[in-house]
From Swiss-Prot:
It is an enzyme of class 3 (hydrolase). It catalyses: Exonucleolytic cleavage in either 5'- to 3'- or 3'- to 5'-direction to yield nucleoside 5'-phosphates. This is Exodeoxyribonuclease 7 large subunit. Keywords: Cytoplasm, Exonuclease, Hydrolase, Nuclease. Its EC number is 3.1.11.6. It is found in: Cytoplasm. Transmembrane segments: none annotated. Heterooligomer composed of large and small subunits.
Length: 449
């Protein structure tokens, strides 16, 4: 049996291993090549991983060393690193303390990303016209992990902004070798079911390896074939995937994605409907008010109140025309007499007598024709005038009253046209053709039919 004093504590063992790491000359300065992974720029010290096809090691680069790096680190970038291996006692993990770092070409994943991006761009898939999102969506599909924070953020935002929206979750694997096929399967399922106004596809943040399913060509082409607009929410705001380029809209966060598919909140929609209703009611009231004013003006117009004045001007025009016609005839007769006198002064004897007789006959004929023409023209004008007067007479309110009709006014002379204009115990006046009759309202009854 081993004595208890011979057992080491975890701390003691870790400290022993750290001393071994620090004392080993082969670990004091190592030269490595690998791809950067799990990198996110921070203020101060930088933490990331170096990996190849079979292994991965954590790396730390202190502020002073990192300040000498003249380029930006990127996910998947292949680099050459000089540093020392050390053990971190609190976690018992060994890691590389990077002292110098420089690029070594392009990382495999990043290179694959750039190649696919270039290929799809050449096909014009990034330049497609964005499909518009509806202002008032009814159904939206969400493709993401059922256990992540993405779906919770989306549900919370939709419940706050537009609670009548129906969200349908299509759970998918969003990380690992099976993720791309799972995403494509769910997208095809949404397309088959149909009836969705938009699709949100996304996941939370992670390394380029974690997000890689959203850079797969099969996923990109499945998104292109979707009949409805697609909103991408993959990773953090600084992450960019092929899915972001293909989607109609890109959202930096799941909350932003939910806001994009609900452009108008339910409260705003209800307020807009209320405002439109008020405007419609006001417009109807204004139209009815203007129509009532026009009717009142028409009822008070000269045509209805003094119809005789309508054809006064026509009587005057006929009289003026008759006077001008008579004056014209007299002028022509005087001119003919003058010509006759002039001709007589130039003739003598028998020739004068013969010429005079002929002229008298001509004058008599002209007088007769003028008289006939004047009578015919006057007759035609009188007939036209009589026809116009008859037409106006039929339109005269007095004529209508003469056929047994009547109209009713109140004490102020306002015409009462509808049952709603009458009040019980109201004094009214009934106007007939030759006068008016006073009356008193005792009952009101609406006719049906």
């Amino acid at each position: 049996m081993v004595d208890a004093s011979q057992y080491l504590s975890v701390t003691a063992l870790t400290q022993y291993l750290k001393r071994k790491f620090d004392a080993d000359p082969y670990l004091a300065k190592v030269y490595l090549t690998g791809e950067i992974s799990n990198y996110r720029k921070r203020v101060g010290n930088q933490y990331f991983s170096l990996k190849d096809d079979h292994a991965k090691i954590g790396a730390l680069m202190f502020r002073n060393a990192f300040s000498k790096v003249q380029f930006d680190l990127e996910e998947g970038m292949k680099v050459l690193v000089v540093g020392r291996v050390s053990l971190y006692e609190p976690s018992g993990e060994y890691r590389l303390i990077v002292e110098h770092l420089e690029p070594d070409g392009v990382g495999a994943l990043y290179q694959a990303f750039e190649q696919l991006k270039k290929k799809l761009a050449a096909e014009g898939l990034f330049d497609r016209n964005q499909r518009p999102l509806p202002l008032f969506p009814k159904r939206v599909a969400v493709v993401t992990s059922p256990s992540g924070a993405v779906i919770q953020d989306i549900m919370t935002t939709v419940a706050r902004r537009y609670p009548i929206l129906q969200l349908t979750l299509f759970p998918a694997v969003v990380q690992g070798d099976q993720a791309a096929d799972s995403l494509v399967k769910r997208l095809n399922q949404i397309k088959t079911i149909g009836g969705f106004d938009a699709v949100i596809i996304g996941r939370g943040g992670g390394s380029i390896e974690d997000l890689w399913p959203f850079n797969e060509e099969k996923v990109a082409r499945a998104l292109v074939d979707m009949p409805m607009p697609v909103v991408s929410s993959v990773g953090h705001e600084t992450d960019t995937t092929i899915t972001d380029f293909i989607a109609d809209r890109r959202a930096a966060t799941p909350t932003a994605a939910a806001e994009i598919v609900t452009p108008v909140t339910l409260i705003d929609a209800l307020n807009r409907i209320s405002e439109d209703r008020v405007r419609l009611v006001n417009a109807m009231h204004n139209r009815l008010k203007n129509a009532a004013i026009r009717v009142q003006r028409s009822a008070q117009s000269v045509v209805l109140t003094q119809p005789d004045r309508l054809y006064d001007q026509y009587v005057q025009r006929v009289d003026q025309f008759q006077q001008r016609l008579q004056q014209s005839m007299h002028n022509r007769l005087r001119e003919a007499d003058h010509r006759l006198a002039m001709a007589a002064s130039q003739l003598d004897g028998r020739q004068l007598f013969i010429r005079l007789v002929n002229l008298q006959r001509q004058v008599t004929g002209d007088r007769h024709r003028l008289d006939q023409a004047m009578r015919g023209l006057v007759k035609t004008k009188r007939q036209a005038f009589a026809s116009a007067v008859s037409g106006l007479d039929h339109l005269s309110p007095l004529k209508i009253l003469g056929r047994g009709f009547a109209y009713v006014t109140d004490e102020q002379g306002q015409m009462l046209k509808s049952l709603s204009d009458y009040e019980l115990d109201q004094d009214i006046h009934i106007h007939v053709a030759d006068g008016q009759v006073g009356a008193h309202v005792t009952t009101k009854e609406k006719t049906h039919g």
